[in-house]
Amino acid sequence: MVIVVFEFEPDETLKDRYFELAAVLLEEVEKIDGFISVERVESISNPGRYVSLSTWQNMAAVNRWREQLDHSQAQDEAKSRKLFLNYRIRVAEVDRDYGPS
């Protein structure tokens, strides 16, 4: 299992555009073989800062998403229009996954 953590701070004037793109991409990511889930939360201590946490079966699934056309085009738009004041992406393999039975 692979977790992708996308921390970001959208430009306040372009935040609506980011969320429009994210809504469209949600429909696309759900079609990717190996996609498990995605959650997005806003920071309590830093309003306007968000974390998107996606879960994947394996790295091959993450790569399929990274190469998906709509996703690539959205990334290009985000870079060219400077939708984000700041962002960081972390990709991690899950060593353990457990909870109550």
Where are these regions (language model features)?
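Conserved short loop/helix modules at catalytic or binding sites
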Residues: 74
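Short S/T/G/P-rich N-terminal loop/turn motif that feeds into the first structured element of a domain
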Residues: 1-50, 57-67, 77, 82-101
